[in-house]
């Protein structure tokens, strides 16, 4: 019986990166032997065990045979006769198919170390094409290791394109797609994920709302990058810089979906695009079963981001309506997320990365002043019933007006 450290722990150590979970591979053992050594079995589809002391995962060496469509149609075969090379052959990328034995020796039958040195994401074997989920995984790895200079090998990208053209992505479950998307959005450079998917055609197959934005122009004065798809990925990058929160990053991704519906005759203007994008966002979220907090913020950002951008032009009564519509009184934390997404939208433009954008600060101060209006004073003044609500709105209006009078507005021209 031989035990090896495999997968991400070996890869990340060789890259000089912090190691995450330590997964182990056991060659030449049976289930009975593992149980006799005190391991507890947790795998249902194939034999995976937890170490009695460290609780790290140990899996018996296995092979996989495709039987059916999609990423779940596999039959696994684990036995003492399965070799290290056979087990590593079933893995997705060469950089994930390196093993380290108990003496610290590396076993690299498929050139993973060389690909680490060359910063290349390359598939291990043609069996890569049997699992459509690997298209998303490769794109996610490209995003994850972008800072280290990794790119997808041309032959792997070509295989991903063939898989996409064959309709393999249709066999992925919504939950699995969202799980990959969630991991990507919580990373450092999620825009790379979408760039890779676009290169292999998977963006159009999975996320047509986003793919439709590429090639759609916006006014050069406000969008020197011109292309709305490029702008969206720039906004996503800015959202990652501004906020670690999944909902903010997802809202940044969806905020301009409505521009994909603008008839070319009206380009580069996109009047009302925020409202036009709402049905697209709802459909996207329903399709992939996106969590409610992400969906709700994305809808708010799409609907209201243009209002925030022109906040200095809004009358206090209009700003009060924005607060009401966003339920800012009861959900101030979500409203702060809305402002972060608007900041990302403003700065996610060529040449606008460091420009002053004071509107969210003004809006936040106006909201704070309106929130500070004490209801108890209105009640103490003798107002009752509907009159309380009317008086509260009036005093909030006055509070916003005072903030507005105190601000020196910035001319962006």
Curated annotation (Swiss-Prot):
Keywords for this protein: ATP-binding, Hydrolase, Magnesium, Metal-binding, Multifunctional enzyme, Nickel, Nucleotide-binding, Nucleotidyltransferase, RNA repair, RNA-binding, Transferase, tRNA processing
Pfam families: HD, PolyA_pol, PolyA_pol_RNAbd
Annotated SMART domains: HDc
Record keyword Transcription present: no
Residues involved in CTP binding: 8, 11, 91, 137, 140
S-S pairs: none
Binding site for ATP: 8, 11, 91, 137, 140
Cofactor binding remark: Magnesium is required for nucleotidyltransferase activity. Nickel for phosphatase activity.
Enzyme Commission number, as recorded: 2.7.7.72, 3.1.3.-, 3.1.4.-
Ligand binding (Mg(2+)): 21, 23
HAMAP family registered for this protein in UniProt: CCA_bact_type1 (MF_01261), CCA_bact_type2 (MF_01262)
Additional note from the record: A single active site specifically recognizes both ATP and CTP and is responsible for their addition.
Assembly and oligomerization: Monomer. Can also form homodimers and oligomers.
PANTHER family found in the cross-reference section: MULTIFUNCTIONAL CCA PROTEIN
Family: Belongs to the tRNA nucleotidyltransferase/poly(A) polymerase family. Bacterial CCA-adding enzyme type 1 subfamily.
Described function: Catalyzes the addition and repair of the essential 3'-terminal CCA sequence in tRNAs without using a nucleic acid template. Adds these three nucleotides in the order of C, C, and A to the tRNA nucleotide-73, using CTP and ATP as substrates and producing inorganic pyrophosphate. tRNA 3'-terminal CCA addition is required both for tRNA processing and repair. Also involved in tRNA surveillance by mediating tandem CCA addition to generate a CCACCA at the 3' terminus of unstable tRNAs. While stable tRNAs receive only 3'-terminal CCA, unstable tRNAs are marked with CCACCA and rapidly degraded.
Protein name according to UniProt: Multifunctional CCA protein
Organism of this sequence: Aeromonas salmonicida (strain A449)
